Amino acid sequence: MKLSIIIIVTSLVIAVVAFPSKDSKAIENDKTEQRMEIVVQETARACSKQIGDKCKRNCECCGKTVVCGTIYVGGKEVNQCMDKTSDNAILNGLGKGMNFIENTFSFCV
């Protein structure tokens, strides 16, 4: 019985100390009082580009196994819609499966 009372009292003391009152003023650099503004950008919801077209997101590319992939042309990074992942037929099939899974989790409408 005494142990349970000690545990309850200790818990209440910790709760009172841990949670500051609403009347307390925030310190200038107090991280709990800083606010962040989140900017939501409009993204493509339906496909508009075919294989070989430049893209920014998977949702822009048409096709279940087509993703917005990165290739390097003359040392520059270029994003374009692609579905081929390898010259090997088995690896290409596995790559298309992975592309399908990636598109599934892109949540394009």
From Swiss-Prot:
Primary subcellular site in the record, as a coarse category: secreted
Cell location: Secreted
One of the record's GO cellular component terms: extracellular region
Signal peptide start and end residues: 1-18
One Gene Ontology molecular-function label? ion channel regulator activity
Keyword Signal (UniProt): yes
**What tissues contain this protein?**
Expressed by the venom gland.
Q: Which UniProt keywords apply?
A: Disulfide bond, Ion channel impairing toxin, Knottin, Secreted, Signal, Toxin
Q: Which positions does the propeptide occupy?
A: 19-46
Q: What is known of its domains?
A: The presence of a 'disulfide through disulfide knot' structurally defines this protein as a knottin.
General function of this protein: Putative ion channel inhibitor.
Task: Tell me the protein's name.
Answer: Hainantoxin-XVIII.2
Q: Which species is this record about? A: Cyriopagopus hainanus (Chinese bird spider)
